Amino acid sequence: MAKVALIQRELKREKLAAKYAAKYAELKAIAADAKRSDEERDAARLGLQKLPRNANPTRQRNRCEITGRPRGTFRQFGLGRAKIRELAFAGDIPGVTKASW
């Protein structure tokens, strides 16, 4: 089980990323637009640097919804590999069966 503080930190990052998503996308588009002047692009880059560090969506980490484990998380289920195995064997995940060929 992950520490509660680590899970809370991830939730904080999600909230910040959602809050600044529009501004982040706008500045990112301006900075990448080759048709704009160098001054505008530099100003956009400075604007990106002034945003909070945790507002960057790449800093988010997928975690298991049950255990908070950061590695081995399947996006489709939002669960770690160990919990997927447990729940699948118990029949709690619809449509998931043990492979046999």
From Swiss-Prot:
Gene3D superfamilies: 1.10.287.1480
One Gene Ontology MF term: structural constituent of ribosome
UniProt key word ATP-binding: no
A Pfam match: Ribosomal_S14
Cellular component annotations (GO), alphabetically ordered: cytoplasm; small ribosomal subunit
Keywords, ordered alphabetically: Ribonucleoprotein, Ribosomal protein, RNA-binding, rRNA-binding
Keyword rRNA-binding on entry: yes
InterPro entries assigned to the protein according to its UniProt record, in alphabetical order: Ribosomal_uS14 (IPR001209), Ribosomal_uS14_bac/plastid (IPR023036)
One biological process term in Gene Ontology: translation
Similarity comment: Belongs to the universal ribosomal protein uS14 family.
Role: Binds 16S rRNA, required for the assembly of 30S particles and may also be responsible for determining the conformation of the 16S rRNA at the A site.
Xref: HAMAP family: Ribosomal_uS14_1 (MF_00537)
Complex and partners: Part of the 30S ribosomal subunit. Contacts proteins S3 and S10.
Stated name of the protein: Small ribosomal subunit protein uS14
Organism of this sequence: Delftia acidovorans (strain DSM 14801 / SPH-1)
